[in-house]
A protein has these predicted regions:
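SAM-dependent transferase fold signal centered on methyltransferase-like domains
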Residues: 1-425
Length: 425
């Protein structure tokens, strides 16, 4: 049968195993002495209780699959053969069956997918959803991959494959359900935090948790962070629980809706000021001496800027050029400029080449930036052998803060403009 059409739930494999009959009281010591020769398989009973036969309580111990009766004794290990003769043990062959329960996901897929096709070993778990990025070679086997993951992981109810790269402005994926329920509404847990989301309508990456941990380590209680592409709030909400105030924004109206839900579910309502707007416009609102007065004092200044989207958000740094010229001098001074944490992608391999390329790119938005000011450069992941995702932390320089503000950028109009600004009680 074509493996692409196998009913994985009823998978059954017949094998022939050699077993040895011996008394119950000798079974444990025999297994201990010949442990490397015993058949071991997940959820497989390697010792069978045969009960009383001719007045003796017997056990059947299964041996490794490569020990076959027709090869006994010539091709069997000498110490095992000696033990069999010494104890007058019976060698028998028995038909056994292996099912879904006896294999890990990787083992099962290795048996079902043809040799030469890479086995998908990594996938993201988001709530009850398993998320794959299958290659062109793996796509013909997507159903068997999905069904295997579904049945081997009881917490997984839906398996999806991403169809294309993230091209739209919201960075939301186009997904295909390849197994399980067609339900992309889920609740994801990250430590003690819960996040409600629709995986198809918002950007989410569970694998960025370690990176969020790293950036959060920069923050101190009572500081204010500006999370410009906050999504459904994984960074903002965790920062708020640390005692920080967070100005958070996302242009995606669906992400904004879930942000408000998650803010309430995690009980940080008073710590977040939530926008559904263009990132640059939010910065200009907070910097503007008049508009900033609408908001509580603890949201009128920010110590850190976190930008984890879009693909290359260094270009958004132009909004910080001239910060001191377009802000309230009572709020902003040369000694309280923010630290910027920006992510992006770079095609260079060595550290020096990466830094040099990034310096060239960032100077287009912050002309006085110098690579020596970088506090930390972190490779988040290797997307492929020629492309790295990075996060770079650096302080906004006094020279750039005192420069004339940029006039090169324009705002993106939010879908729900009437709801794009926070409601202030």
């Amino acid at each position: 049968m074509d493996c692409k059409e196998i009913d994985i739930q009823n998978y059954k494999e017949e094998i022939q195993l050699c077993g040895l009959k011996l008394a119950k009281e000798k079974a444990n010591s025999f297994i201990e002495q010949h442990r490397k020769l015993i058949f071991e398989k997940m959820n497989f009973n390697k010792v069978v209780n045969l009960g009383a036969i001719d007045g003796e309580d017997l056990r059947l111990i299964f041996l490794k699959q490569d020990l076959q009766e027709q090869d006994f004794p010539e091709k069997w290990p000498k110490d095992l053969v000696d033990d069999i003769y010494k104890n007058n043990l019976s060698v028998i062959t028995q038909k056994c069956y292996l099912t879904l329960d006896n294999y890990s996901s990787i083992e099962l897929l290795s048996k079902l997918i043809p040799c030469g096709i890479p086995i998908p070993t990594g996938y993201e778990i988001v709530g009850h959803i398993a998320h794959f990025n299958l290659t062109h070679q793996q796509l013909p086997y997507k159903k068997i991959i999905g069904e295997t993951i579904l049945h081997k992981n009881k917490c997984i109810k839906t398996v999806v494959n991403k169809l294309e790269k993230l091209h739209n402005v919201y960075r939301t994926p186009e997904l295909e359900v390849i197994a399980g329920e067609n339900n992309l509404e889920t609740i994801h847990k990250e430590g003690k935090f819960v996040f409600h989301l629709n995986f198809e309508k918002v950007y989410w990456c569970s694998r960025l948790q370690v990176e969020r941990d790293r950036i959060l380590s920069y923050l101190k209680p009572n500081q204010t962070a500006l999370d410009l592409f906050c999504g459904i709030g994984p960074f903002s909400i965790r920062a708020a629980k640390m005692g920080c105030n967070v100005i958070c924004n996302d242009l995606n109206p669906h992400a904004y809706d879930y942000l408000l839900i998650n803010r309430n579910k995690n009980k940080v309502e008073d710590k977040l000021l939530c926008f559904n707007n263009d990132a640059r416009k939010v910065v200009d609102i907070i910097l503007n001496p008049i508009s900033v007065k609408k908001y509580p004092k603890n949201f009128q200044h920010f110590d850190h800027v976190y930008m984890n989207l879009p693909v290359n958000n260094i270009e958004f740094c132009d909004v910080f050029l001239g910060l001191l010229k377009k802000s309230d001098p009572e709020i902003w001074k040369t000694d309280n400029l923010p630290i910027i944490h920006a992510t992006g992608f770079v095609k260079q391999s060595s550290y020096e080449d990466c830094i040099s390329e990034i310096e060239i790119r960032i100077k287009k938005t912050l002309p006085n930036f110098v690579k020596e000011s970088i506090l930390q450069f972190q490779v988040i992941k290797n997307v492929n052998p020629h492309l790295q995702m990075f996060c770079m932390s650096f302080p906004l320089s006094i020279e750039d803060a005192l420069s004339d503000p940029s006039k090169a950028y324009q705002y993106i109009k939010p879908e729900r403009e009437e709801e794009s600004l926070p409601l202030i009680k």
